[in-house]
Amino acid sequence: MPGLLLDTLNRTRSDRVPLWLMRQAGRYLPEYRELRARKGGFLELVYDSEAAREVTLQPIRRFGFDGAILFSDILIVPHALGQKLEFLAGEGPHLSPRLADAELEALSTVPERLDAIYETVRQVRAALDPETTLLGFAGSPWTVATYMVAGEGSRDQQAARSMAYTDPGKLQAIVDAIIDLTVEYLVGQIDAGAEAVQLFDSWAGSLAPDQFERWVIAPNAAIVRRLKEARPDALVIGFPKGAGAKLSAYAAGTGVDAIALDETIDPAWAHTVLPDGMPVQGNLDPLQILAGGDAMVERTKAILGALADRPHVFNLGHGIDKHTPIGHVERLVDTVRNWQR
């Protein structure tokens, strides 16, 4: 029997609103920190299917979320495309060779690096209650390309943004390679047991309006189209963080089934500009749940009220902060669970 989250993504509006949180499996949980300390590095944890299964299940056991999102990372795709991937303490991810300097042809694809992720999905699906929806995910091509070009994360994505103007053909080739492998990757996740997938475009907001169509809308549309050609029942949540006024163009142009709002979007405005009946996910500010208190509860109720007339999945506007107290999450869960349309 499909769960509440899956029903909502299929455009059913229920009395109760389903709930999950971006980065719900992670460092704010003491059980995660304990497992991470035993296992060592982040990447080792991701590629250890038994450990990754356990991390994925930890927030489900503790909070009873309606969705379990695969514990992995968006940079698994460039790793499978042949870049060396390291997570350095205090520095974040590093990819080499950086494609600002090297050519894409210098990379040798290693698709078998994805096999451990598929095994994690299989193990999680086998362990989950049937009514808990299993979510897979991948990074969207623009966001993944920003890391591949720069070799690391950056505040302004300057390397990739500059390449979009100075060598758009090279950037297009990188994006096309990401699209190809991402479609394969998402098909593999669905075949292993994922019931819906989310495309994270964390740096969509860094592009000028005339660049947004080419590097955000078109690549995501290609993934959605090809994924649905391969798996017609696939459900896709799009998350164009920072899209702002371009949100409606993204919704219309990509073909995603549902759209996730970041915390800067007024949900009442989103309700007026998005297609009727389209499920919306979001969008409490991660810093508001970090702060907690009555203000968090009131804002949560305001978001629920603003989206009461369409299918709504409650979530944050981005990933939960690692310092968020468990008690604040528990209070959020209680607030959403006790709210009715």
Swiss-Prot record:
PROSITE patterns: UROD_1, UROD_2
Pathway: Porphyrin-containing compound metabolism; protoporphyrin-IX biosynthesis; coproporphyrinogen-III from 5-aminolevulinate: step 4/4
Keywords: Cytoplasm, Decarboxylase, Lyase, Porphyrin biosynthesis
Cited InterPro entries: UROD/MetE-like_sf, Uroporphyrinogen_deCO2ase_HemE, Uroporphyrinogen_deCOase
Annotated EC: 4.1.1.37
Coiled coil: none
Gene3D superfamilies: 3.20.20.210
Binding residue positions for substrate: 23-27, 73, 147, 202, 318
SUPFAM superfamilies referenced in this protein's UniProt entry, alphabetically: UROD/MetE-like
Enzyme category, top tier: lyase
HAMAP family registered for this protein in UniProt: URO_D
Function: Catalyzes the decarboxylation of four acetate groups of uroporphyrinogen-III to yield coproporphyrinogen-III.
Name of the featured protein: Uroporphyrinogen decarboxylase
Protein source organism: Erythrobacter litoralis (strain HTCC2594)
